[in-house]
Amino acid sequence: LQPASPVHIPAAAHALWNSDEAERVQSSSGGFFSLLARHTLAQGGAVFGAVLDAHLPPSGDVAVAVSGGSDSMCLLSALTEELGPMRGSKYVQSDLGDTFRQARALLEAGTPVLFSGVPCQIDGLLRFLGRDYEHLLTCDLVCHGVPSPAVFRAWLDTLEARQGSTVRQVRFKDKSHGWSHPYLSVTFADGGVYTEDFNRTCYGRGFGMQLFLRPACAVCKYTSVSRPADFTLADYWGLDPALELPVERDKGVSMVLVNSARGRAVFQELSPRFGQVERPLEEAVAGNP
């Protein structure tokens, strides 16, 4: 095994929102991932992120790392218009396929890479690479645990049987009822749409009760502020309700930890494109236990 990747402990948390309101509304929280992705793509780089199979576009602009599962890690290397499927939460384990090798080949060729994933995936990537690349940027997520793809598929089968049509799109956190009241939205091939408070669905309840997370999640070693990635992203649950923000809170606020010198440099470069308030790290931890 490769040595453990370096860990970083941030000094503070950032309550952050993308200045592009449309992009913010389309995102799970405040839209910071989109800023990182566009920054990388503008440099001629490549972005690795999770895409549900139901979302995969037919064009060659997205190179699909693996297909056939419920959630696949994909490489986006051309049109920023295809960024949409990478936005949003996916509450199911992703199939990394050959993405580590793809990332290494790109990095060896001098191509900037943004790799996003849960912290164990980022740590795995860094161990696989075995060395630092100055044009690699990583972001991990505050993770509740990853559900079994088999359970996810069984749940989709139930929805399809009830609707009599195949699922074409799943949005786990639709903001149509506001960021603080996330709704599940499932679109079917026949045009039908099923929406419900995610936490009231059987899948959402089981996820919240940790009934079908992968076994490794029970002994996760990444449940701390010591992070392997340059950035850590989450919803900013627990943000002081008395704090006045210059934007509408219920359109989404990201919790961002800047964990490295490389991350700080990119954060500063992107600062004209977002608003943010620096907050105590303890507040962010309390809101995302």
Question: Which role fits each region the language model picked out?
Answer:
Residues Q2-P289:
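Iron-sulfur-associated redox domains of electron-transfer enzymes in respiratory
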